[in-house]
């Protein structure tokens, strides 16, 4: 590839590739026109571009860090797991097909053509392309059909930087082993290592760094400290980490961890003021201060699982007592009925919802609504009435049409008579400070606590914070030399 570029690969999933790319995009954007690129992403969390295309949320974040508008070319192939070894394929931001892994691999040649076109368009509009691999780079069973690691490396011939995670142990073996297993034509382009999530005394680590460099002939560009990010998470591994985190806040919000959960980043903004507890269907719901039902890749099947587990009855028992929010698929579940023509579950049928909202949803065709929106709050009740008439922003990613006689955000959403059960199709709802503060004000006052609205860190501040950490701990002179600037 003639354009300046760099490919960030990893030894495994969740080693920090996306964060490193975000930081690099921010750093380079100070002097160059930069674009992120990930040929193929598998993610439960997605983002809608201004022109209504769906991409992985990580690439949207990276683009914004680079100061450029997110586009479908930055993530030409998005795989959204639906369960039962089937994923929905999003091609250049549009729904393409639902396929098993085996069937998907049969169309790799077609996918390659798509990503090559996307990459060419990005190169025409930007000075530097910062590319990201997926999972572990050394998946030797997938080399011949891997488009995101080996495929991208071979297509672009870009210099490669390999990221390893020291937090989970075995980082030296992971880095050395990954390099050893890479095909020779790819291995020769590995120009540096980054060790991520380090806690402790760097002096103790240095002998290992030296031996790694001697054994591989590849320099360690830097050791990045463990750092709590203030940007949205990408995948379900992040969700596991959240569940392990300690949170001593006095307000507890239970998020139902649906088997096919999607866009759980919707609730991350609430972590600043409340303890967010992800509850499995077979777990005790406890006595939360509020309940959230998130989006899902299959509303019907998750609704059936919710009922079979007994969790549906537990949620229904809280009606009128605490706030219950449903977003996207969770909103659909809150209604009285869901009619499926076969789009969701393969057969035509009508299902009874939770009955907490006076709405009904119909899945009539394989068609997804993807759009960024600005809405005006028009609602009553103890939570939303204080912000009646104010604007909020969000984005929609859903199939199905819902009929509601009590819209609360323009022509979207619904609310019960008490104003405590609230449903909406808007992802990013709690990114709106007025919505977030309205909910927290209600929850804090109900417990006799004083709510002090947080001073929200802006997106730009978060990107700068991350970029500064990376810049301070990376050999930037060597990095610039590697990418040729």
Curated annotation (Swiss-Prot):
Keyword terms of this UniProt record: Cobalamin biosynthesis, Glutamine amidotransferase
Positions annotated as active site in the UniProt record: 328 (nucleophile), 427
Pathway annotation: Cofactor biosynthesis; adenosylcobalamin biosynthesis
Family per similarity comment: Belongs to the CobB/CobQ family. CobQ subfamily.
Its biological purpose: Catalyzes amidations at positions B, D, E, and G on adenosylcobyrinic A,C-diamide. NH(2) groups are provided by glutamine, and one molecule of ATP is hydrogenolyzed for each amidation.
Gene responsible for this protein: cobQ
Organism from which the protein derives: Methanosarcina barkeri (strain Fusaro / DSM 804)
GO biological process, one term: cobalamin biosynthetic process
Domain GATase cobBQ-type: 250-435
Pfam family, one: CbiA
UniProt keyword NADP present: no
Protein name: Probable cobyric acid synthase
PANTHER family in the record: COBYRIC ACID SYNTHASE, DETHIOBIOTIN SYNTHETASE
Domain of life the protein comes from: Archaea
One annotated GO molecular function: catalytic activity
């Amino acid at each position: 590839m003639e354009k300046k570029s760099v490919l960030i690969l990893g030894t495994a999933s969740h080693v920090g590739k996306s964060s490193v790319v975000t930081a690099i995009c921010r750093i380079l954007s100070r002097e160059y026109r930069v674009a992120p690129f990930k040929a193929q992403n598998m993610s439960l969390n997605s983002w809608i571009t201004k022109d209504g295309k769906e991409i992985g949320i990580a690439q949207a974040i990276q683009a914004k860090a680079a100061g450029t508008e997110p586009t479908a070319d930055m993530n030409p192939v998005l795989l959204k797991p639906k369960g039962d070894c089937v994923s929905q394929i999003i091609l250049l931001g549009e729904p393409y097909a639902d396929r098993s892994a085996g069937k998907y691999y049969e169309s790799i040649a077609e996918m390659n053509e798509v990503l090559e076109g996307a990459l060419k368009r990005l190169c025409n509009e930007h000075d530097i392309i910062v590319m990201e691999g997926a999972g572990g780079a050394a998946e030797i069973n997938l080399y011949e059909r891997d488009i995101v690691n080996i495929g991208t490396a071979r297509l672009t011939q870009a210099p490669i930087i390999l990221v390893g995670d020291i937090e989970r142990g075995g980082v030296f073996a992971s880095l050395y082993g990954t390099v050893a297993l890479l095909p020779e034509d790819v291995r020769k382009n590995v120009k540096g290592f980054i060790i991520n999530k380090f806690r402790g005394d760097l002096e103790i680590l240095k002998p290992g760094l030296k031996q790694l460099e001697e054994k591989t002939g590849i320099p360690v560009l830097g050791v990045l400290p463990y750092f709590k990010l203030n940007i949205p998470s990408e995948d379900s591994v992040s969700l596991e980490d959240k569940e392990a985190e300690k949170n001593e806040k006095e307000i507890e919000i239970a998020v139902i961890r649906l088997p096919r959960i999607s866009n759980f980043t919707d609730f991350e903004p609430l972590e600043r003021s409340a303890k967010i507890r992800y509850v499995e269907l077979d777990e005790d719901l406890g006595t939360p201060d509020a309940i959230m039902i998130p989006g899902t890749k299959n509303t019907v099947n998750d609704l059936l699982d919710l009922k079979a587990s007994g969790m549906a009855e537990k949620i229904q028992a809280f009606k009128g007592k605490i706030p219950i929010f449903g977003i996207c698929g969770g909103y659909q579940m809150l209604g009285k009925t869901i009619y499926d023509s076969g789009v969701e579950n393969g057969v035509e049928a009508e299902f009874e919802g939770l009955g907490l909202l006076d709405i009904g949803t119909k899945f009539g065709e394989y068609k997804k609504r993807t759009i960024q929106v600005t809405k005006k709050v028009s609602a009553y009740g103890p939570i939303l009435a204080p912000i009646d008439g104010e604007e909020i922003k969000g984005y929609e990613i859903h199939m199905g049409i819902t009929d509601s006689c009590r819209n609360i955000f323009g022509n979207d959403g619904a609310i019960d008579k008490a104003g405590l059960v609230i449903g909406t199709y808007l992802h990013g709802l709690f990114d709106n400070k007025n919505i977030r503060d309205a909910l927290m004000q209600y929850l804090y006052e109900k417990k006799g606590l004083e709510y002090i609205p947080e001073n929200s860190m802006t997106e730009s501040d978060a990107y700068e914070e991350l970029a500064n950490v990376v810049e301070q701990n990376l050999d930037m002179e060597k990095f610039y030399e590697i990418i040729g600037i």
